[in-house]
Structures are given as C-alpha cells and as structure tokens.
Amino acid sequence: MTIASTRWEREKEKDMKNYEKYKVGYFMPPVCEMTWVKKDHIDQAPIWCSVDLRDGNQALIVPMSLTEKLEYFQFLVEVGFKEIEVGFPAASETEYEFLRTLIEENRIPEDVTIQVLTQSRDHIIEETFRALKGAKKAIVHLYNSTSYAQRQQVFRMEKKEIIDIAVHGAQLFNHYAQTMPETEFQFQYSPESFTGTEMEFALEICNEVIGVWQPTADRKVIINLPATVAMSMPHVYAGQIEYMCANLRDRENLIVSLHPHNDRGTAVADSELG
C-alpha cells in the first residue's frame, strides 16, 4: 500500500465520521404519548398568519422599501389573510414608518388584524406600543431566548433570570395596553428557540407569562412555539407540541401557534404533525 492510498483511506474514514459533529440539540418531553399518530387528516382549519413582511423580509439581502412593503401588504390582504405580521417597528425607521403609514392612512381593513414583534426589552416594548398608537386592533408578540445553548453561551444566565425577563416584559405589555384603551390588543408570547429548550422549562416560562396576562374566553392569549432552528425529525417537534398543549395552564383560553423554520426542509411536515 502506498503512502498516498493510506492517506486517502484516512481521509475517507474521517469524512464518513463527519456526522458525529451533529449532536442532538433538542429535548424530548418527559411524557410523549404521540396521540396525534391516530389522526389521518386535519379536521379543523388553522388560523393563518402571514409573517412574510417581517420574517421573510429579514431573509432578503436587500430588505423591502416602504413602497414595496405597502404593495406587499395589499397583496396579502387580497390573498385573504386576516392576521398579518407587519414587522418589528422598533428595529428600523422603515419598519416604524411602514406601521405608521398603515395606521394613519387607514390601510388596514376592518376584518384584518396586524401583528408586531418585540423583544422583552423595556425601550423596545415602549417604542413598539408607541408605533401602534391609533390602531383599532393589534396582536403584540413578545419573545425572549430560552434555549439551553443561548442561556449558557450567550446570556450566561440561570433559568430564573430568563423567566424574570419574560415576566417583566409581560407586565410592561399590561401597563402600555392600559394606556391605549382605544386599541383592542391581543398578546402573544414565544420562547425563542423553543426546540432547543428543555420542555419542562419551556412550559414553566410560558405558564409564568400566561399568569401575568390572565387570559379569558373573550381575550385569549397566543402561545407561539417556534422551531427557530429546526433540530429534529418532525415527529419530535410534534411530541414537543403535544406535551405543551397537554400541560399549559388555562389551555381553554389559549391559542397555540406554530412557527417552524425550514432548516431541514421539514417545515410543512412540522406544521401538519404539530
């Protein structure tokens, strides 16, 4: 055997073991009954919310201009969407002006509810509610990072500290909504990177936020469970959703929302199974 062939064999063996770097980053729930397996079809229409103007826009190399955003919003209305996420108004002047234009020029149909996104940070929440001044109704979407990796490597925080961030943001939502009685608000919370979060912790932090908002049958809270990074086969995500739905407090007064990204090419399967 030549030196060259020996080296080739070593490189081949190394490449074949390349899969080992992909560690399991998700967490299975403590109880996973997978009752959804018994369903062979979806028998109830979901509520569709377009996130193209926010999440889709972030994916573009050159984000949409104000004019393009207005045209796209009108297109989504014509398609028939009744909930449309219009952006992250505290993120940039364009995002802010887009929202203000929709409100001030009365471009939002009576049967359409706009949605905006905000991190759980004081000044961003304040700016977000300011941008909504004059809106007839709106969904305000709060999020903060909860995954094991982000807690350990980015924020270097304990679980209690992460919960405090979410709860404080939820309390600010209550405060600002009370100052704007002319607007009909619906609140939404996301544990960002839900799929990389321990399920017991995801449940705990969601329940803490729900406790602050006190949903009712007439004022339901949305709990969004995103696959911010797709980490598993679809049945794992479905098991995670099943666990959350079975254990969230005030479940009858909640709307559970799914937001799967397509990193693994399984976003549609994630949505249907979840």
Where are the language model's segments positioned?
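A generic structural signal for short
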Residues: 60-61, 158, 259
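Conserved short loop/turn motifs at secondary-structure junctions
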Residues: 86-91, 116-117, 190-195, 226-230, ...
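Generic secretory/membrane-interface signal
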Residues: 3-5, 14, 49, 186, ...
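Alpha/beta enzyme core
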Residues: 19, 48, 64-83, 99-105, ...
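N-terminal capping/small domains of soluble enzymes
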Residues: 2-122
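Thiamine diphosphate
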Residues: 262-274
